[in-house]
């Protein structure tokens, strides 16, 4: 699941990910995707021991902490505030149980609907909303593989 | 992963899912979520042997077959046609390799951006776009658990 979250982060316009815990095999597979499809020059993949220190650092930098949780405020009711929130954004998504600390230290707890579904979907929808869909036109200059969109079938250009 | 796809289908407004293959444990866990959070009256969860027969039946019924694939046409370039496509929609998402047959028998091959990421995210974005975000206000009459959105922390009403 974490792999899908990270691939969504990259494909939907995030600048990188902090991953709590250690998973060498997963990081290796991610770096392979980035090497082929692009993003090596800027997309950060960092394993960390404790997310709380990152949250505190982020606050000191003057950024905004967004926690995506089904218990939060519906994103539809938050949409008009997107323009005013201070960047950079740190977006927190949790797999299983997320500690209460994050709820109380996030600037905003935002729900992608108040129903159980998936942190993968939650991150995708949030990024799609803040970038207003433009992220889906992203091109990666250092990509070795590029897709030529097709009505049916597959067309890919390979370089490098 | 299939569990996440199904939870997204339910939470984002689909009427049900056909799952190719057999996975009793997974179906049981899904039905448990539906029993608690609602949707039992209409949300179909059906295991099937072969997706192709469903596609053919769907066509005979006059519905539209949408295949979500990174090789397809960017959803942003398809958006204006949403109003004209004939319902009901059968949306095909594949985990690993999807057979060429589906590419050539779908009415539309649509890409949620032409980058590798996740079928979970692809389905969520597609449904969010066709329902214009309204699906995130969905309420389930038969729900035994309901969330009261909170700025911080969790508030849930349990009934039945």
From Swiss-Prot, chains A, B:
Quaternary structure annotation from Swiss-Prot or TrEMBL: Homodimer.
Record-linked Gene3D superfamilies: 3.40.1280.10
Keywords recorded for this protein, A-Z: Cytoplasm, Methyltransferase, S-adenosyl-L-methionine, Transferase, tRNA processing
Family assignment from sequence similarity: Belongs to the aTrm56 family.
Binding site for S-adenosyl-L-methionine: 68, 94-98, 112-119
Listed name of the protein: tRNA (cytidine(56)-2'-O)-methyltransferase
Function: Specifically catalyzes the AdoMet-dependent 2'-O-ribose methylation of cytidine at position 56 in tRNAs.
GO biological process annotation, one example: tRNA nucleoside ribose methylation
Species per Swiss-Prot/TrEMBL record: Saccharolobus solfataricus (strain ATCC 35092 / DSM 1617 / JCM 11322 / P2)
């Amino acid at each position: 699941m974490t792999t899908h979250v990270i691939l969504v982060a990259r494909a939907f316009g995030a600048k990188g990910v902090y991953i709590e815990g250690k998973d060498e095999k997963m990081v290796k597979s991610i770096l392979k995707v980035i090497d082929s499809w692009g993003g090596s020059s800027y997309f950060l993949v960092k394993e960390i021991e404790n997310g709380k220190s990152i949250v505190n650092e982020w606050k000191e930098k003057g950024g905004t902490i967004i926690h995506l949780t089904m218990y939060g405020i519906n994103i539809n009711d938050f949409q008009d505030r997107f323009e005013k929130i201070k960047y950079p954004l740190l977006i927190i998504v949790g797999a299983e149980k997320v500690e209460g600390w994050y709820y109380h230290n996030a600037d905003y707890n935002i729900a992608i609907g108040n129903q159980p579904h998936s942190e993968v979907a939650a991150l995708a929808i949030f990024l799609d909303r803040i970038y207003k869909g433009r992220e889906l036109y992203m091109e990666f200059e250092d990509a070795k593989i590029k897709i030529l969109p097709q009505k049916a079938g597959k067309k890919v250009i390979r370089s490098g």
